């Protein structure tokens, strides 16, 4: 783990302490064996290399949304991609994390939202019940469908 974190710290332009703490927390949230945490690190590095987002900002945002994203049904790799998308829009990781958490929490309780929310869904060609079922079946697919509408 120490060697992996040292490599991540260098690649992510973060201190080893910050990288280690963030990755340990993510490993705990997503129940990733420490021996496999390098796969998440590799994915974050790849996302950073292919987007305007810095790896350290992706890690920071991902650390803020890990629990909510997991509860929503996203894997760690899917959550990392979502964090990357928001950070790539030029938002600071704190803002990206807050926005992602808010969106996922609203969608997680879609069936409990008020009439205005349900009317907006209807205008998008969706229903609260249908979206709730879609999230339960395929969280990432439902989220992509919602965002693409």
PLM region descriptions:
Residues 1-149:
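Amphipathic alpha-helical interface segments used for oligomerization, scaffolding
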